């Protein structure tokens, strides 16, 4: 009888542990930054900086200035200042070809655009109008519904 109870307890434990889900990787996991550590350093220095339209300092920054400064820091590559100019300075790629450093473009309204830098694992860093400099998920319903194009800056 004791062996039967032990078997049942072990079976239940194995069943429960096999069905548990592991949480999504945290934003700062090593895998997120595997291709360019400078992006991680840059993000750490700018995290939580408030959004300010037209801003380009730690007092406040907009999305295109954030991308511009990140590229200069991490890739020593000068990008144009505006979202549409960054769009024009990059080449379209297929979603399946994405890699860290690609630019994600969103149409947030009929005439407004937003840009961020793809990291890995469905995540991108950007200057959010409501939350400042953060990492968001591309599969977030809001961002997924606003997604427009993914593009690559040729180095």
Feature locations, PLM:
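Bacterial N-terminal signal peptides that target proteins for export
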Residues: 1-8
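Hydrophobic helical h-region of N-terminal Sec-dependent signal peptides
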Residues: 9-13
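C-terminal motif of bacterial Sec signal peptides marking the signal peptidase cleavage site
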Residues: 15-18
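N-terminal capping segments
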Residues: 20-91, 114, 127
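A broad detector of the eukaryotic-type serine/threonine protein kinase catalytic domain
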Residues: 48-52, 103, 155
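...with weaker cross-activation on analogous glycine-rich loops/strands in unrelated enzymes
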Residues: 77-134, 138-140
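Glycine- and charge-enriched low-complexity intrinsically disordered segments
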Residues: 143-155
């Amino acid at each position: 009888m004791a062996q039967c109870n032990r078997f049942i307890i072990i079976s239940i434990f194995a069943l429960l542990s096999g069905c548990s889900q592991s949480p999504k990787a945290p934003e700062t996991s090593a895998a997120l930054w595997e291709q360019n550590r400078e992006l991680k350093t840059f993000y750490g220095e700018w995290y939580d900086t408030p959004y300010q339209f037209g801003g380009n300092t730690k007092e406040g920054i907009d999305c295109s200035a954030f991308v511009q400064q990140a590229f200069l820091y991490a890739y020593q590559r000068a990008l144009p200042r505006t979202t549409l100019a960054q769009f024009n300075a990059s080449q379209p790629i297929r979603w399946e070809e994405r890699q860290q450093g690609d630019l994600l473009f969103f149409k947030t309204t009929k005439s407004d655009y937003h840009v961020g830098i793809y990291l890995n694992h469905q995540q991108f860093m950007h200057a959010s109008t409501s939350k400042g400099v953060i990492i968001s998920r591309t599969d977030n319903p809001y961002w997924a519904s606003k997604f427009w194009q993914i593009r690559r800056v040729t180095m």
